[in-house]
Amino acid sequence: MQPSGHRLRDIEHHPLLTDNDNYDSASSSSSETDMADRVWFIRDGCGMVCAVMTWLLVVYADFVVTFVMLLPSKDFWYSVVNGVLFNCLAVLALSSHLRTMLTDPGAVPKGNATKEYMESLQLKPGEVIYKCPKCCCIKPERAHHCSICKRCIRKMDHHCPWVNNCVGEKNQRFFVLFTMYIALSSVHALILCGLQFISCVRGQWTECSDFSPPITVILLVFLCLEGLLFFTFTAVMFGTQIHSICNDETEIERLKSEKPTWERRLRWEGMKSVFGGPPSLLWMNPFVGFRLRRLQMRTRKGGPEFSV
């Protein structure tokens, strides 16, 4: 039954939930604080494979840079400076990847379209609200349903299989940092590859590496291809994300050419909203706000999920 005084708009014309509907009361009454305290993890096969591949490719790049190019070098400070720099970029990139993957992107609580919740909203007469028929929640403005996460996500930009998660309101910052650090480490690796090729050609491939010349060439060529591919992809994604933040428009909203019904923020206001606070070095730190949590498995209606 639909409460008077407002209208519930549902594309599939599902009725408003009542107390007798078969939904988990715990999920419908969960607060935003409870949602924020959970470690988020999407059990999607494709996403998990892509996430593991990302880590393996970064580890491979670190192996080639460290053991093929830097350790055999006779220039001590060249090896130390570049080794520290590349490994720092790799650690920051992988840390940003983890934060993006394990952070709730802004999921709307499931099954909150109850009569009690509707009454608590204190809606004005004639005001229209939207309900998602798939996860049975009241959709806030600019929220979209993700078929992979099976949740409505606030300010959903897109679902990225490489981080096995949606990019939304709460984890967009970490995704931006991930793309930035991968792009920087790719540029660094490409520069080192170029210098290594020059050194090997001048030395006639005799003392440029501890590996045989054919293996060295194969490792360097593969790293160059990986670096070019990663740099192109992440640089484009980084630019797209910064453009979206500055224009206060998600990728989904841009593709749908939706007319804004919200007041757009100024460019710097959008950046401060995503990265938190005025410009500082903390914007570059993926560890800000990190809390070590204990993972455990809880069985809930609809399947198991990881939580604390």
Curated annotation (Swiss-Prot):
Q: What residue stretches are annotated with the DHHC domain?
A: 130-180
Q: Per the record, what ranges lie on the membrane's Lumenal side?
A: 72-75, 195-217
Q: Does the keyword Thylakoid apply?
A: no
* Gene Ontology terms: cellular component: Golgi apparatus; Golgi membrane; nucleoplasm
Q: What happens when the gene is disrupted?
A: Homozygous knockout mice are viable, fertile and do not display overt phenotype. Knockout mice are hyperglycemic, glucose intolerant and develop a type II diabetic syndrome. Zdhhc3 and Zdhhc7 double knockout mice show a perinatally lethal phenotype.
Membrane topology (UniProt): Multi-pass membrane protein
Q: Provide the function of this protein.
A: Golgi-localized palmitoyltransferase that catalyzes the addition of palmitate onto various protein substrates and therefore functions in several unrelated biological processes. Has no stringent fatty acid selectivity and in addition to palmitate can also transfer onto target proteins myristate from tetradecanoyl-CoA and stearate from octadecanoyl-CoA. Palmitoylates sex steroid hormone receptors, including ESR1, PGR and AR, thereby regulating their targeting to the plasma membrane and their function in rapid intracellular signaling upon binding of sex hormones.
Q: Which protein are we looking at? A: Palmitoyltransferase ZDHHC7
Which organism does this record belong to? Mus musculus
Gene designation: Zdhhc7
